[in-house]
Amino acid sequence: VLTGEDKKHVQHIWGLLSGAEEDLGAEVLYRMFQSYPPTKTYFPHFDVTQGSEQIRGHGKKFMAALGNAVKNVDNLSQALSELSNLHAYNLRVDPVNFKFLSQCLQVALAARLGKEYSPEVHSAVDKFMAAVAAVLAEKYR
């Protein structure tokens, strides 16, 4: 459960990323494809090389969706409803992949933010991403 302090940490970190969302999103996706190669099966039409236009474009969408979740942290189910439907019913993404993406995001944040990504912030981001993953997986039940 996200506490008020957790929400502040997530919102603060998100503010630090302003302007770098596309680069970070591309880095996160590339990390996921490298660390968890089976995730590439959901993107058969993508050029999965580092910095490709497809990775950059989808990374930007990923970060925009997370930005929307950060803004609507108290109502994630409503904020992510369409995305949940898309991933569950149309794309049929295995929910375990949301955890993989979360791990890759956290590695990228730690590498990018250094000391700003304190243990408290890491914990808050982990809880936030777990909440996002849970909402995205709601439609699978």
Swiss-Prot record:
<dbReference type="GO" id="GO:0072562">
    <property type="term" value="C:blood microparticle"/>
</dbReference>
<dbReference type="GO" id="GO:0005344">
    <property type="term" value="F:oxygen carrier activity"/>
</dbReference>
<comment type="function">
    <text>Involved in oxygen transport from the lung to the various peripheral tissues.</text>
</comment>
<feature type="domain" description="Globin">
    <location>
        <begin position="1"/>
        <end position="141"/>
    </location>
</feature>
<dbReference type="GO" id="GO:0019825">
    <property type="term" value="F:oxygen binding"/>
</dbReference>
<dbReference type="GO" id="GO:0042744">
    <property type="term" value="P:hydrogen peroxide catabolic process"/>
</dbReference>
<comment type="similarity">
    <text>Belongs to the globin family.</text>
</comment>
<feature type="binding site" description="distal binding residue">
    <location>
        <position position="58"/>
    </location>
    <ligand>
        <name>heme b</name>
    </ligand>
</feature>
<dbReference type="InterPro" id="IPR002339">
    <property type="entry name" value="Hemoglobin_pi"/>
</dbReference>
<feature type="binding site" description="proximal binding residue">
    <location>
        <position position="87"/>
    </location>
    <ligand>
        <name>heme b</name>
    </ligand>
</feature>
<keyword id="KW-0479">Metal-binding</keyword>
<dbReference type="GO" id="GO:0005833">
    <property type="term" value="C:hemoglobin complex"/>
</dbReference>
<dbReference type="GO" id="GO:0031838">
    <property type="term" value="C:haptoglobin-hemoglobin complex"/>
</dbReference>
<dbReference type="InterPro" id="IPR000971">
    <property type="entry name" value="Globin"/>
</dbReference>
<keyword id="KW-0813">Transport</keyword>
<dbReference type="GO" id="GO:0031720">
    <property type="term" value="F:haptoglobin binding"/>
</dbReference>
<dbReference type="InterPro" id="IPR050056">
    <property type="entry name" value="Hemoglobin_oxygen_transport"/>
</dbReference>
<dbReference type="GO" id="GO:0043177">
    <property type="term" value="F:organic acid binding"/>
</dbReference>
<dbReference type="GO" id="GO:0020037">
    <property type="term" value="F:heme binding"/>
</dbReference>
<dbReference type="GO" id="GO:0004601">
    <property type="term" value="F:peroxidase activity"/>
</dbReference>
<dbReference type="InterPro" id="IPR012292">
    <property type="entry name" value="Globin/Proto"/>
</dbReference>
<keyword id="KW-0561">Oxygen transport</keyword>
<keyword id="KW-0349">Heme</keyword>
<comment type="subunit">
    <text>Heterotetramer of two alpha-D chains and two beta chains.</text>
</comment>
<dbReference type="GO" id="GO:0005506">
    <property type="term" value="F:iron ion binding"/>
</dbReference>
<dbReference type="Pfam" id="PF00042">
    <property type="entry name" value="Globin"/>
</dbReference>
<keyword id="KW-0408">Iron</keyword>
<dbReference type="InterPro" id="IPR009050">
    <property type="entry name" value="Globin-like_sf"/>
</dbReference>
<protein>
    <recommendedName>
        <fullName>Hemoglobin subunit alpha-D</fullName>
    </recommendedName>
</protein>
<dbReference type="InterPro" id="IPR002338">
    <property type="entry name" value="Hemoglobin_a-typ"/>
</dbReference>
